[in-house]
Structures are given as structure tokens and as C-alpha cells.
Amino acid sequence: GELCKNTPITNGSDLLKNGEDRPNTIYGSTDCGISVENGTALTYKFDKPEYIRTLHLTFNSDLNRDTLPGDFPERSHSMRCNVKLDSPQCYVPKTLCRKFSLSLGTPSGTKMIIDTDCNLRRSYNIDINEAVQSITLIPYSNWGETDKTQIFSYDFK
């Protein structure tokens, strides 16, 4: 909505609000979202409490399989029926956020929505349904143990 579009994200970018949940050549994009230093808080702050219905969050789960081991056939055929002993092992995508927290600043204090150190999900659609003063996302690590974590979408209605 308009509120999300017009509210800046501290340490973030409007690329998180453009509706693209993955790079797609149909949209003319080769990349989307932003990469943030682990431990950096991405915060929406409001001048007064605003009613938020839902929050949408999408991390990079390497749908293009660029970080998987092996050659193209190994990366593109995820449901192999014949697995050789020397076949590359599949694992959680290295680009996926592993540890993060999501909290709301409410008139009565901070409300933790998600605080996980073993995330396996690419996308979240979270019902909020309350008036909040701020929304804060902090990615702490990813499965590839790099210094930055890529976030594709972080918006609300």
C-alpha cells in the first residue's frame, strides 16, 4: 500500500518494496533485493502508530541453484532417481538466511514476532493486525556463513 511505499527503511532500500521475490528476466532483472551486513537492523519507523495488516518477507533461497555443487545437470535435476556414491550432496541453499529476528515496536513495548536460529523457509506472510510504531528485521547469518545476507522482499500492507 501507500504507507509502505512512502515509508523509508532505515539501512534498507526501496528495492525491498518493488514486489519482486526473485530475479526474473521477464521483469528485465538479473538481481533483486539487497545484500545487508549480518547484524544490521532494517527498520520501518512511523511518526504515530499505524495499523498494519500483514508483513511479507522473502529471502534468497538460490532458486537458480547457482551455489549448488556439480555441473548443470546435477544442479537442474533436483529429483534424481539414480544417485551415485560420488554425486554432489544437496543441502540448504548457502544464500538462505539462517538466523534472524523480526520485531514490532508497539505503544506497550517491543513485541518479538520471529526469533530463529535455524530458518529453513524462503518466504513469510505474517498476519500482524495491530497498530505499530516500528517494524525491525535483523538478519544475523546465512547458511553459507558469509558476511552478508540477501533479502528480496520486506514490505507490509
Located regions from the model:
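Predominantly extracellular/luminal regions of secreted and cell-surface proteins
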Residues: 1-21
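Aromatic, loop-rich ligand-recognition surfaces of beta-strand-rich domains
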Residues: 22-110, 118-157
